[in-house]
Regions:
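Helix-loop-strand module that forms the ligand-binding subsite of alpha/beta enzymes
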Residues: 66-150
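A short beta-strand-loop structural module common to alpha/beta enzyme folds
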Residues: 48-62
C-alpha cells in the first residue's frame, strides 16, 4: 500500500445525504500517521458513513461552508477524528468549526440545524494516559482538555457522546492499535445502538444574549452567516 496516498483516497468532496454519519478526519500529515490513517481506512469501510478527509478536501484552507452545512444537516451523528495537537484540535479542524458552525444556523436565534444530533470525538495522543495526570508532565487529566469541544456541541444543541481516545499512539503495540481500530469500527457501525446512549440526556439549552453579538440586527436572518464567528 502506498501510505502517502492512504489519507486522501476516496472522494475529496463527499456528497451530502447518502448517510446519517458524517465523519471529519483531520490530520495535517497522513504520511506521519500511525493510528489515524488506519482509523480512516476503517471508517471508509463502514456502510452509512460519509468520510471527509479535511486536509485533502481543503488544502488551501478555503472551507466550503454551505457544502459542509448540507452534510451536517443530513447527518445524525457527527464524528470529529484527529490527533490532539497542543491539547486541542488541528488548525484546519478549528477553522472548520469557526467557518461552519455559524450564528443563526448552528446556534443563537433560529440556529437549530444541529439540535438533537450527536457529536463523537475520536482522538489520539502522543502522551501516555499516565502523562495526563496531576503528577504527570501534562499536569491535568485528559478530560480537562475537553470542555471546549463539549460546550461547542451543547451550544449547538448536540449531545456529547463519550469520546474514544487512544493514548500513547507512538508506543502502543501493533496489537493495541489493531484492537483500537476494531473497537472504533465496531462502534461506528453499530451507532446508535450503544448501551450508554439511552442514558444520556438531551443537551441543555444555551441561549446567547444579543448583547454578546457584534451587531444584533445582522444576525437573525436564518441564513448561514459563514465567517461571522462567534462574537
Ligand atoms: C504539532 C503537534 C502537537 C502535538 N500536541 C500534542 C499534545 O498536546 N498532546 C499529546 O499527547 N500529543 C501531542 N502531539 C502528538 C500527536 O497527538 C500524536 O503524534 C498523534 O496523536 C499520533 O497519531 P497518528 O499516528 O495518527 O499521527 C502533537 C503532535 C504534533 C505534530
Amino acid at each position: 500500500m502506498d501510505e502517502t496516498k492512504e489519507g486522501s483516497r476516496g472522494n475529496a468532496h463527499p456528497r451530502a445525504g447518502d448517510s446519517d454519519v458524517y465523519l471529519l478526519a483531520a490530520h495535517p500529515d497522513w504520511r506521519e500517521s500511525r493510528v489515524n490513517k488506519r482509523l480512516l481506512a476503517a471508517a471508509r469501510g463502514v456502510p452509512g458513513v460519509t468520510v471527509n478527509d479535511l486536509y485533502a478536501a481543503y488544502p488551501d484552507y478555503a472551507i466550503d461552508g454551505p457544502a459542509e452545512q448540507e452534510r451536517l444537516a443530513a447527518a445524525r451523528l457527527v464524528v470529529l477524528m484527529h490527533p490532539i495537537q497542543w491539547y486541542s484540535m488541528p488548525a484546519l479542524q478549528k477553522l472548520w468549526v469557526d467557518d461552519v458552525l455559524a450564528y443563526g444556523w448552528a446556534y443563537g436565534p433560529g440556529g437549530t440545524a444541529l439540535k438533537g444530533k450527536d457529536l463523537w470525538l475520536v482522538l489520539t495522543t502522543g502522551g501516555q494516559e499516565e502523562a495526563y495526570h496531576p503528577s504527570g508532565y501534562n499536569r491535568y487529566f485528559f478530560d480537562a482538555f475537553l470542555p471546549p469541544y463539549e460546550q461547542t456541541a451543547v451550544l449547538c444543541g448536540m449531545r456529547f457522546l463519550p469520546p474514544l481516545v487512544m493514548h500513547g499512539s507512538h508506543s502502543a503495540s501493533e496489537q493495541e492499535v489493531l484492537d483500537h481500530v476494531q473497537t472504533f469500527a465496531q462502534r461506528l457501525g453499530s451507532y446508535p445502538d450503544w448501551p450508554e446512549i439511552a442514558e444520556l440526556d438531551a443537551a441543555p439549552a444555551c441561549e446567547v444574549p444579543p448583547s454578546d453579538r457584534p451587531d444584533a440586527d445582522d444576525d437573525a436572518d436564518g441564513v448561514a452567516d459563514v465567517r461571522h464567528g462567534m462574537a
